[in-house]
């Protein structure tokens, strides 16, 4: 019986090709096959480094059906790599279902660390990095996005979001409206690329800068927002505790309204706590 292979989770550059580590290059050269989010994109990356390996497209629409097939190959002794289009796989990218299935099957899963847009942005933001929460992409629909931001408005930890270029302006508008125009934030754009910019200031200032400069609405974005003041977070925590008790005896809307009146916390922030 053959020894099972290894699934390597390989981080790839988010812009600057020089950020692909020597170890990552070695792994990509030696595995049997590379599972890639977009094989066309990954093929270009491999060509730059003179690497030729079979590729298998693994994305959000087929991961659940392909996982079993990939696990079978790993069990047979093949070692495979998983990459995303940019950065570390699984971080707002496919791969979770495969990694979970591999671990359940007793396959060794090992990280090959490297670039990550959220960590790169946080490291240069000047905002507290000892405690933070990563929210990925906010909902595309305005109502759902605002509801999510309302729930996060009193989060005391530094908040990190990804955002697309066609939504960056309206996202900053919603952030300023819901979090408060004076909340400090950072907008990091095109990190490690030629047109990299890192803007900082109040949400109101950033909203204006991005709205008035078309170039600042192009590319890939990481938004980092200062956490809420401790007293605001304490209100939310207490409000959610009281809401949980009250909703056992009252309709959710009535329980939230009463808990908000008792604690001074925003009513909408108490749902789902």
Swiss-Prot record:
Class in the EC hierarchy, top level: transferase
Family matches, as Pfam families: RsmI_C, TP_methylase
EC numbers, comma separated: 2.1.1.198
Superkingdom of this protein's organism: Bacteria
Localization, UniProt: Cytoplasm
One MF annotation (Gene Ontology) recorded for this entry: rRNA (cytosine-2'-O-)-methyltransferase activity
Catalytic function, reaction form: cytidine(1402) in 16S rRNA + S-adenosyl-L-methionine = 2'-O-methylcytidine(1402) in 16S rRNA + S-adenosyl-L-homocysteine + H(+)
Keywords, alphabetical: Cytoplasm, Methyltransferase, rRNA processing, S-adenosyl-L-methionine, Transferase
GO CC, any one term: cytoplasm
Biological function: Catalyzes the 2'-O-methylation of the ribose of cytidine 1402 (C1402) in 16S rRNA.
UniProt record similarity statement: Belongs to the methyltransferase superfamily. RsmI family.
Protein name (Swiss-Prot/TrEMBL): Ribosomal RNA small subunit methyltransferase I
Species of the source: Xylella fastidiosa (strain Temecula1 / ATCC 700964)
